[in-house]
C-alpha cells in the first residue's frame, strides 16, 4: 500500500464498498456525535466522510484531531446509512470506517477558518493566502484559471501559432507606465527593467522572419491597483502575426476568444460574430469606447432638436451656443416608475459633477404622445415628437438628457445609460457580449499645448494612403485630425480585454507620423533607435493584440475583483503581505550594486 494514499478524497464511489483503502488530507470538519466521530477529510480532489467509533483502535487518536490537521487514515469503504447520503458530494453515497489514523501535520489555531466560506478582511486573506486558497471557491477559481490558460494555448496552436519566450530583463521603456527597475551588478549605475509588455520583442520576432507568435506573457507595471487590474504584474495572451491586415487579426483572434468563453461559460450566451463598432459611433451611442452591449439602450444626439427656435429651455440652449451638445438616454417603461426613481437619478448625476439630468416622460393623449416633467413645458410638442422618434420611445417611456461640452456630455450619458439599464432591469446579465472597437483617431488636438498630438498608439499604421500621408502638410489640421489608425480594442461586458494594432513597419511613415505630432527625427532615434534600426533592415507588415488573461479569467469566474483569480496577488498598495515584499535589503547587497539610498524624510 502506498505510504500516503491509495485513493484521493474525491474518488470513492459505491463500487468501492468493501475495499480497504488509504486516504490523506486535511480535516475539513470534525463532528462529535457522542462516541462516534465524523471527520470530513479534504484534499485537492474532493471530500470524503470518515467515521470512527469507540470500537476502533484509531478512536483515541481521532479524538485529538482538530480542523485543518493533516492526517492519513486507513479503513474500509461502506455505504452511508439510508437517508444520510449527501447528493452534493460525488463521494456522498459512501463513507470510510477508520481502522488506523496517523497525524502527518498539526495546525495551530487558525487566523481564519477554511470551512464555511465566511467573509474575512482582505488583509487577513492576503496575509494568509495559503489558507484562503484551501477554501472551495478560491481553489476552484485558480483551477479554472489553469484550465482556461490550457485552452488558450491549445486554440492558439490549432490556429497555426507557435509559442515563444521573450526576455524578462530588458531595457527601460520611455513610454507607458513606470518601469520596475533592476540594478546591474556587472554594470554599475545601469539598470534593467522588467517588461511592461513584450511589444518590441514580439515585433522583432516578426522582423526576424517568424510568422505567428504567441506567448502567455508576464508583464510588469508600476501602477496603482484597480478592481480589474492587479498592481505589479499581470499576464496577457500576447499575439503577433506577419503579412496580415486588420481583418486577418480579427479572424484569427475571434474564434480563440469565442471558443474559450463558450467552453467555460457555464450556460451563459456568448456573442456569435463580434460586431465591429467605429470609435466615433461607440462614443455617440454608448458614451464610452468600451461599451457594455448587454445593455440595450442607445444614446442619441438631440442637439439639433434643442436648437429649434421654439425650444425655450435656456440651460440647454446656452450649452449649444457655447459649442456643446445634448445627448438623450432612453428609459423604456420608466413612466411607470415613482417620482423617487427620477429624483435618485438626478441626485446621482449631481454626485457625478453635473447639475442633474433633465427628463421627459411620455404619455398618450388623444392618440398622440405628450410629454410631462420638469423641462417638458419648455419643449413644444413637435420637438418632443422628434426626440421620441429619434430615441425610439413610445407612451410609458421616458428620456433623460445630458448636456455640456461633447466629451463631458458623452461621458455622463454613458454612465447614465449603465445606471438606467441596471435600475430598470434591462441589462441581460447572463451573457458575454463582445465587440471590436475600430477606427480610432490617429491624432487629437492637445488643448493645453495648442498642438496636434497622438491620440492613442503612436506606433500603429495610419489608415491613409502612404504616399499621400508622406506628403501631408503638418499645418493641415483638418485633414490630420480626420485620419484614422489601424487600431482596435476588444471589449466584453464593458471591460476592455485588449488593445491591438497593425504596426507601422515603414521608417519613413513613422518619421512622418512623429513629425506631424511635433517630434523630430532625433527624438525617435534617441528613444526608439533599436526598433527603427530593425525596421530599416526589411520589416514585413505585421500586427497583433494582447488580451489580458487575468481579465478573461475574472469574467469567466464571475468575480468583480481580479485578486479573486490570481494565485498570490498583492494588495492595493502593491505589497505582498504574506512574503513581506517589498522589503529592505542588507547594506552588503546595496554595496554590491553600488547603490546608496536617499530616502524621503518620513517625519516631514
From Swiss-Prot:
It comes from the Bacteria. Transmembrane segments: none annotated. Its EC number is 6.1.1.23. Pfam families: GAD, tRNA-synt_2, tRNA_anti-codon. SUPFAM superfamilies: Class II aaRS and biotin synthetases (SSF55681), GAD domain-like (SSF55261), Nucleic acid-binding proteins (SSF50249). It catalyses: tRNA(Asx) + L-aspartate + ATP = L-aspartyl-tRNA(Asx) + AMP + diphosphate. This is Aspartate--tRNA(Asp/Asn) ligase. It comes from Methylobacterium sp. (strain 4-46).
Amino acid at each position: 500500500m502506498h505510504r500516503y494514499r491509495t485513493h484521493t478524497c474525491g474518488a470513492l464511489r459505491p463500487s468501492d464498498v468493501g475495499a480497504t483503502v488509504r486516504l490523506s488530507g486535511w480535516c475539513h470538519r470534525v463532528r462529535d456525535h457522542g462516541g462516534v466521530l465524523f471527520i470530513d477529510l479534504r484534499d485537492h480532489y474532493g471530500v470524503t466522510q470518515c467515521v470512527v467509533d469507540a470500537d476502533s483502535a484509531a478512536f483515541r487518536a481521532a479524538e485529538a484531531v482538530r480542523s485543518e490537521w493533516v492526517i492519513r487514515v486507513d479503513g474500509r469503504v461502506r455505504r452511508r446509512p439510508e437517508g444520510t447520503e449527501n447528493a452534493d458530494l460525488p463521494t456522498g453515497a459512501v463513507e470510510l470506517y477508520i481502522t488506523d489514523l496517523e497525524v502527518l501535520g498539526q495546525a495551530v489555531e487558525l487566523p481564519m477558518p477554511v470551512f464555511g466560506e465566511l467573509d474575512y478582511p482582505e488583509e487577513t486573506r492576503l496575509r494568509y493566502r495559503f489558507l484562503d486558497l484551501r477554501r472551495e471557491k478560491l481553489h476552484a477559481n485558480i483551477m479554472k484559471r489553469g484550465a482556461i490558460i490550457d485552452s488558450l494555448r491549445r486554440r492558439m496552436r490549432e490556429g497555426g501559432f507557435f509559442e515563444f519566450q521573450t526576455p524578462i530583463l530588458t531595457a527601460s521603456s520611455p513610454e507607458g507606465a513606470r518601469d520596475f527597475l533592476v540594478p546591474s551588478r556587472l554594470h554599475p549605475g545601469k539598470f534593467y527593467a522588467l517588461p511592461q509588455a513584450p511589444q518590441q520583442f514580439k515585433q522583432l520576432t516578426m522582423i526576424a522572419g517568424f510568422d505567428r507568435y504567441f506567448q502567455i506573457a508576464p508583464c510588469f507595471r508600476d501602477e496603482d491597483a484597480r478592481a480589474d487590474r492587479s498592481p505589479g504584474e499581470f499576464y496577457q495572451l500576447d499575439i503577433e502575426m506577419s503579412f496580415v491586415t486588420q481583418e486577418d487579426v480579427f479572424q484569427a483572434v475571434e474564434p480563440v476568444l469565442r471558443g474559450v468563453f463558450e467552453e467555460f461559460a457555464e450556460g451563459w450566451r456568448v456573442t456569435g460574430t463580434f460586431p465591429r463598432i467605429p470609435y466615433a459611433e461607440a462614443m455617440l451611442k454608448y458614451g464610452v469606447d468600451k461599451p457594455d452591449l448587454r445593455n440595450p439602450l442607445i444614446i442619441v444626439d438631440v442637439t439639433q432638436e434643442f436648437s429649434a427656435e421654439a425650444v425655450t429651455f435656456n440651460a440647454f440652449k446656452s450649452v449649444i451656443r457655447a459649442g456643446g451638445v445634448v445627448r438623450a438616454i432612453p428609459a423604456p417603461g420608466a413612466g411607470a416608475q415613482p417620482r423617487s426613481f427620477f429624483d435618485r437619478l438626478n441626485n446621482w448625476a449631481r454626485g457625478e459633477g453635473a447639475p442633474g439630468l433633465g427628463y421627459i416622460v411620455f404619455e398618450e393623449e388623444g392618440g398622440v404622445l405628450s410629454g410631462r416633467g420638469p423641462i417638458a413645458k419648455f419643449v413644444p410638442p413637435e420637438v418632443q415628437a422628434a426626440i421620441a422618434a429619434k430615441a425610439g420611445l413610445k407612451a410609458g417611456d421616458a428620456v433623460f438628457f445630458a448636456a455640456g461640452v461633447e466629451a463631458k456630455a458623452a461621458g455622463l450619458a454613458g454612465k447614465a445609460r449603465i445606471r438606467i439599464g441596471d435600475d430598470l432591469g434591462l441589462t441581460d446579465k447572463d451573457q458575454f457580449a463582445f465587440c471590436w472597437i475600430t477606427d480610432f483617431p490617429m491624432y487629437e488636438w492637445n488643448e493645453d499645448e495648442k498642438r496636434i498630438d497622438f491620440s492613442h498608439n503612436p506606433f500603429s499604421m495610419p489608415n491613409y494612403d502612404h504616399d499621400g500621408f508622406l506628403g501631408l502638410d503638418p499645418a493641415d489640421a483638418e485633414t490630420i485630425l480626420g485620419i484614422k489608425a489601424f487600431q482596435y480594442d476588444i471589449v466584453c461586458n464593458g471591460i476592455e480585454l485588449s488593445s491591438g494594432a497593425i504596426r507601422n513597419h515603414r521608417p519613413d511613415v513613422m518619421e512622418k507620423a512623429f513629425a506631424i505630432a511635433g517630434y523630430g527625427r532625433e527624438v525617435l532615434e534617441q528613444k526608439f533607435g533599436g526598433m527603427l534600426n530593425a525596421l530599416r533592415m526589411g520589416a514585413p507588415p505585421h500586427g497583433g493584440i494582447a488580451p489580458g488573461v487575468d481579465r478573461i479569467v475574472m469574467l469567466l469566474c464571475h468575480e468583480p475583483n481580479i485578486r479573486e483569480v490570481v494565485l498570490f496577488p498583492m494588495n492595493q498598495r502593491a505589497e505582498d503581505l504574506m512574503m513581506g515584499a517589498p522589503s529592505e535589503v542588507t547594506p552588503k547587497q546595496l554595496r554590491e550594486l553600488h547603490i546608496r539610498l536617499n530616502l524621503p524624510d518620513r517625519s516631514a
